[in-house]
Amino acid sequence: MEGCVAQSKWLAYCRLMRIDKPIGSLLLLWPTYWALWLAGGTAPGGKLLLVFTCGVFFMRAAGCVINDFADRHFDGHVKRTCQRPLPCGALSEREAKALFVLLVGLSFALVLTLNAMTIWLSVAALTLAWLYPFIKRFSHLPQVILGMAFGWSIPMAYAAVGESLPLSCWLLFAANICWTVAYDTQYAMVDRDDDLRIGIKSTAILFGRYDRLVIGLLQLATLLLLLWVGDLNQLQGAYYWGVLLAAVLFVYQQQLITRRARTSCFRAFMNNNYVGLILFLGILLAL
């Protein structure tokens, strides 16, 4: 019996960290890899690659924990989230806070192996990760904060590789914010009816019937900023093929969300993993 309880507790911790749903980690990983390769113009060293890869998974898990802690009184009223570990009682609030501290501690231990500039930037990363879950109580733009949080690994990567933050770094950061707001709005469209009922704010609610238009404009801005990054870094043809394929996927996503059906909006959101991967492969082949 004790073994079953321990196993259930372990599974609850895994679910709280979204180990069973790696899409969030991947959407955070691809921009990190874009920056690591672009910052040095070549493949990063093994140490940097290991530190940033592990850091992505630790901080994404920490972000999920603090998000669920912040939403613990709301998730039970939403169909998609009512079975999460905190609202269903599989884990206590104290256990969630302890896990958050552990994950942040592991992430900071990794950052301490890097230079001082990267360490200072990591403080902002933690602030953004903590701020995002609470912003949706007061603003319809939590997706913008999420975009900054998901993209903060970009200036950190540039700092770790070259101890500088050139224009291409901030253009890539801006592109990632536009992309993140676009795909997380698709994600928020899944929960829009529930969020309206319980008073949670999101860009999906803010944009209303113009949601598809705004998502399209954000996707266009993402592509234009990526083209600018390619020009500044004098990247070869493979990169631009990657941007073109990303544009094709954006068109496909627009088709998916036409009727705003929950399952189709979620499929559009999930499709963004391929966008990130294709762009990374384009960078890889262009350098």
Swiss-Prot record:
UniProt keyword Endoplasmic reticulum, yes or no = no
Q: Where in or outside the cell?
A: Cell inner membrane
Q: Its pathway?
A: Cofactor biosynthesis; ubiquinone biosynthesis
CDD domains from the UniProt entry: PT_UbiA_COQ2
Cofactor or coenzyme needed: Mg(2+)
Entry GO MF terms: 4-hydroxybenzoate polyprenyltransferase activity
Q: Which UniProt keywords apply?
A: Cell inner membrane, Cell membrane, Magnesium, Membrane, Transferase, Transmembrane, Transmembrane helix, Ubiquinone biosynthesis
Q: How does it sit in the membrane?
A: Multi-pass membrane protein
Q: Any idea of its EC number?
A: 2.5.1.39
Q: Single Gene Ontology BP term? A: ubiquinone biosynthetic process
Task: Quote the PROSITE patterns the UniProt record gives.
Answer: UBIA
**Which InterPro entries does its entry note?**
HB_polyprenyltransferase-like (IPR006370), Prenyltransferase (IPR039653), UbiA_prenyltransferase (IPR000537), UbiA_prenylTrfase_CS (IPR030470), UbiA_sf (IPR044878)
Record keyword Chaperone present? no
Q: Which GO terms describe its cellular component?
A: plasma membrane
* Annotated catalysed reactions: all-trans-octaprenyl diphosphate + 4-hydroxybenzoate = 4-hydroxy-3-(all-trans-octaprenyl)benzoate + diphosphate
Segments traversing the membrane:
23-43, 46-66, 99-119, 141-161, 162-182, 213-233, 237-257, 266-286
Q: What family does the Swiss-Prot or TrEMBL record give for this protein?
A: Belongs to the UbiA prenyltransferase family.
Q: What does this protein do?
A: Catalyzes the prenylation of para-hydroxybenzoate (PHB) with an all-trans polyprenyl group. Mediates the second step in the final reaction sequence of ubiquinone-8 (UQ-8) biosynthesis, which is the condensation of the polyisoprenoid side chain with PHB, generating the first membrane-bound Q intermediate 3-octaprenyl-4-hydroxybenzoate.
- Mind telling me what this protein is named? 4-hydroxybenzoate octaprenyltransferase
- The gene is ubiA
